[in-house]
Amino acid sequence: MMLPQGYTFRKLKLTDYDNQYLETLKVLTTVGEISKEDFTELYNHWSSLPSIYHPYVITNASGIVVATGMLFVEKKLIHECGKVGHIEDISVAKSEQGKKLGYYLVTSLTKVAQENDCYKVILDCSPENVGFYEKCGYKDGGVEMVCRF
């Protein structure tokens, strides 16, 4: 599948703070107030660990972030010190939904996980999103348990 004309899938850039990155992420969940300084600090942390953090975005022809996603690669002792990919923070701007950007994002992050030698990729989702992730090639692999603080 290809992106619509004018759209680009790429790694997150520091300048995306000013290109609607946080606003797009807010479609998914509560983000809170994140200053440019806070964003820069987190971006630099992610950039210092490129084998672990793989933040990606989809931008429109104007360079505005319209979809977000993160692949986090966890190094394990099991599976001969194998790696597991975790897909997180999939969010598509409301005005861009229905264009298969989420599908493109998830399948592209899955490929990034394969390229990073992950033996599997996992993600958590709400029950109403199960059908979407099944279309992306995922299947029910268990139950997510949470302890929030």
UniProtKB/Swiss-Prot annotation:
Residues binding substrate, per UniProt: T29, K76, L77, I78, H79, E88, D89, I90, Y119, K120, D124, R148
Gene3D superfamilies xrefs: 3.40.630.30
Lineage: Eukaryota, Fungi, Dikarya, Ascomycota, Saccharomycotina
Organism: Candida albicans
Binding site for acetyl-CoA: I90, S91, V92, G98, K99, K100, L101, G102, Y103, Y133, E134, K135
Cellular compartments per GO CC: fungal biofilm matrix
Protein name stated in the entry: Glucosamine 6-phosphate N-acetyltransferase
Catalysed conversion reaction: D-glucosamine 6-phosphate + acetyl-CoA = N-acetyl-D-glucosamine 6-phosphate + CoA + H(+)
PANTHER family: GLUCOSAMINE 6-PHOSPHATE N-ACETYLTRANSFERASE
